Amino acid sequence: MEAANALKEKGNKALSAGNLDEAVKCYTEAIKLDPKNHVLYSNRSAAYAKKKEFTKALEDGSKTVELKADWGKGYSRKAAALEFLNRFEEAKKTYEEGLRHEPTNAQLKEGLQNMEARLAEKKFMNPFNSPNLFQKLESDPRTRALLSDPSYKELIEQLRNKPSDLGTKLQDPRVMTTLSVLLGVELGNVDEEEEDTPPPPPPQPKKETKPEPMEEDLPENKKQAQKEKELGNEAYKKKDFETALKHYGQARELDPANMTYITNQAAVYFEMGDYSKCRELCEKAIEVGRENREDYRLIAKAYARIGNSYFKEEKNKEAIQFFNKSLAEHRTPEVLKKCQQAEKILKEQERVAYINPDLALEAKNKGNESFQKGDYPQAMKHYSEAIKRNPNDAKLYSNRAACYTKLLEFLLAVKDCEECIRLEPSFIKGYTRKAAALEAMKDFTKAMDAYQKAMELDSTSKEATDGYQRCMMSQYNRNDNPEDVKRRAMADPEVQQIMSDPAMRLILEQMQKDPQALSDHLKNPVIAQKIQKLMDVGLIAIR
């Protein structure tokens, strides 16, 4: 095992230095010695991903999950490989599966958010991917005639499957007309005759509902029950609750199969603050409603009132249970909003209740022990537990950042350092660890800024001064080949999003062909910001 660990450390150094072939070789030899070690497959997956060998990265990510199904990192590796292979739905499912094992894993949460955004963007950015595409084209006279042309159908299928070709097809007037129809905006100067516009579809016939019986058709007991209900409503509005209860009770005696009179009684007890009696009556109303096959909306209303009664008593767990029962019967925005509000409060209550500085210290000490043994994944788990137990301790974020750096998760290390600095701006380790992570990412300018701030706190800090000088020399001697620049840039989620935007790709192509077009594009602040980002990471240069 010692030999395998030595090879793993050697592989980590090679990976950090960008020597990918050497890293893969070291991890492969280590796996031969320790074939059940999930961390080795995880690290080799990262190396393959950096080499752009995404199929192999996926194989190792899958093996990691197989060996250690409760380890979030394995799911991150597998999902990242799937994402690079453009298998976005599978990547999303993998992130979700990982979160079922590690619900608080920040990397998995961030990955899932990015994936959901990518999928939403992909759907939005490709109007030709609409499920009812041909129905839309058939319903508009401008495109209906085009559908008889096989070449037009072939063109539509091409754009449906490969939206990146749109930029090369914009000169085709058929494409502009089609976009006008699909997007619902006028993109050209074609004048349409009013009479050619199809008339609006006839209104949908109202869904037949069981007609309310006319009062004269009602049996005498039901007529009398309704009158009692109206008297109860008048008293309720005046907050004369005793009188309201009396009339609702009489209505219920006259028409015991009508659940409405029972829920009316429950509403009175709710206003009186007798929530236990309110719930008892709502349960009875639901029972009567089920027996008499009442409208599901009335059942939902009774469940919602039970939920509201628990919410008033600050019993959020029970409130959520009954709000969800109400939503299962009939979904309304009001109940959904109340349910989400209760969930938010409950989550915060559980978070606060979990805080315990003494247990945080225990977890921190366990993390320190694991870190000293070189078991960085285990150390990270202990530090994460300590943070949940004491989220305002800046040093815990610093310690976890050190773990992330050892695991080559530099972006997460930077994020933890920034939280550490926010909580304790005078803690120098927050700045030096942030700088070290940025330096490892070869972002020397930002690393120097962080080292500079550390030196402002302590001018004698050798770690800060040495790091600053090292970054200066690295920046001065930098001679990256274009592939390295591109690889580093494309690891940035913001850059990935910009480069996957068909509109931005069209703009970049236009800038290459016509440099004068740049000034026009820079007038748009959103586009200018994206261009600046691509310049900052070295993907484009403007002279």
UniProtKB/Swiss-Prot annotation:
Segments of skewed composition (Basic and acidic residues): 205-235
Compartmental location: Cytoplasm; Nucleus; Dynein axonemal particle
The organism's place on the tree of life at top rank: Eukaryota
Gene3D superfamilies per UniProt: 1.10.260.100, Tetratricopeptide repeat domain
Protein name (record): Stress-induced-phosphoprotein 1
The TPR repeat ranges on this chain: 4-37, 38-71, 39-71, 72-105, 225-258, 259-292, 260-292, 300-333, 360-393, 394-427, 395-427, 428-461
Covalent S-S links between cysteines: none
One MF term in the entry's GO annotations: Hsp90 protein binding
PROSITE patterns: TPR (PS50005), TPR_REGION (PS50293)
Keywords noted in UniProt: Cytoplasm, Nucleus, Repeat, TPR repeat
GO cellular component, one term: nucleus
Function: Acts as a co-chaperone for HSP90AA1. Mediates the association of the molecular chaperones HSPA8/HSC70 and HSP90.
Record's keyword annotation contains Disulfide bond: no
Residue ranges constituting the STI1 domain according to the UniProt record: 130-169, 492-531
Region (Disordered): 189-235
InterPro entries reported for this sequence: STI1/HOP_DP, STI1_HS-bd, TPR-like_helical_dom_sf, TPR_rpt
